[in-house]
Amino acid sequence: MSAVDVESRVRHQNFWFVACFAVLVIQIAVEYMMGRVPICACGYVKLWEGGVNTSGNSQHLSDWYTPSHIIHGFLFYGLAHLILRRKPLAAKLLLALVIESGWELLENSPLIIDRYRTATIALDYYGDSILNSAMDTVFMCVGFFFARRAPVALTVAIATFFEIFTGYIIRDNLTLNVVMLIWPVEAIKVWQGGV
């Protein structure tokens, strides 16, 4: 490979990574314009928020829903690998970031916030802080890069563990969240309310 080819390849890869960073910046800017709070209204930032039905949930760096975003990364890597097989890794990451950022914007819209509050146990959910939402996207990237390196069986095992563990501890996880958002089941809502 000639020096010109290497330089062209590096420039091409850099373009994709700049585009990835731009998606995250746009997500943050749009959430700010939507009126989302930058950090928790409590005025401080915690590494971990362990409460589920608390005012700090979805406001700090990580919480019980962080494993769901890591699983998003696993899933989005798989999708990108299938449909962008010949594209560079950064192009695959860009697809994952566009999907995750799109979800974060939708999740923090009045439509979805109201849906969560009426169909799930998240009665006091008012949306994520910008910091939490951005970290959700970063954790998706962690899952994406993990899935790229790890054997598929290990990735599936970790996703299964995350789902079972969070389901057991907080009676919620990615699967239950999707079910309750799309097709609420009263029995699940009652069970989740027992936390």
From Swiss-Prot:
Q: Give yes or no: UniProt keyword Membrane.
A: yes
Cellular component per GO? plasma membrane
Which residue spans traverse the membrane? 15-35, 64-84, 127-147, 150-170
Signal peptide feature range? none
Locations listed in the record:
Cell membrane
Domain of life here? Bacteria
Task: Report how it sits in the membrane.
Answer: Multi-pass membrane protein
Q: Output the InterPro entries linked to this UniProt entry.
A: DUF2585 (IPR019691)
The record's similarity note reads:
Belongs to the UPF0314 family.
What is the protein named?
UPF0314 protein RL4541
Give the lineage.
Bacteria, Pseudomonadati, Pseudomonadota, Alphaproteobacteria, Hyphomicrobiales
